[in-house]
Amino acid sequence: MTQGPTDTHKGLSWIADAYDIGFTLTLGEGLSPHELLRGVGAEEHRIVPLSCSAASELLLRDEEDHIGDLDFLDREDEAAVARLTDGGFLPTPPDAIVRAGAVAGWAYALEEFSCHTGEHIAALSRRGRALCVHRSAAGFSRVDYALRGEAVTSFEPGLPHLTNGVPAEEALGFTHDGDEAGDVAFLRFLEDRFGISIPWEETEAELPSAAFT
């Protein structure tokens, strides 16, 4: 479950605090939310609107748990239960839930814990740029960047010797030599470089979502 940041409308860096156990933020230029979800393997008829808290409940439950224990779901609502079951959210908890939205010419996706979208960055860049920022539960961070269908670079902010591909400074103009966590520094860089701001309240509300196992 995410915790609300102090400033809920500023840029992207709040994501690192709100999803403090682990997160993935993915950005695809020129895509709609549904196009992004289909681009990472979702079938259109299996996309379901979910809030952040509902997605967390579905990820953290055990298969043996009764669906009546889900706070967001009325178990008497057979249509809602059927949509979640057909979408792969029930009865077995999925490995990843990807929730997608749109902002200023980009589609974005958020994952709690997982990094399913990271495998599809090149495909998501077919109309321009695509980026993926991931922080693992162990605290390791990685950024992937692709341009027009081609992977450009994959790096850990602040650790240039771990780069695969073009150096981050050459590919994106990003350097990091401060005390701030690398993923936070890169999120702030994206705010400034691309002018992207995702309101926290929007990400808490229902967004098109897909489950992956």
Segment roles from a protein language model:
Residues 4-160:
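Hydrophobic alpha-helical segments that drive targeting, anchoring, or assembly
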Residues 2-12, 136-213:
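Long, compositionally biased intrinsically disordered terminal regions
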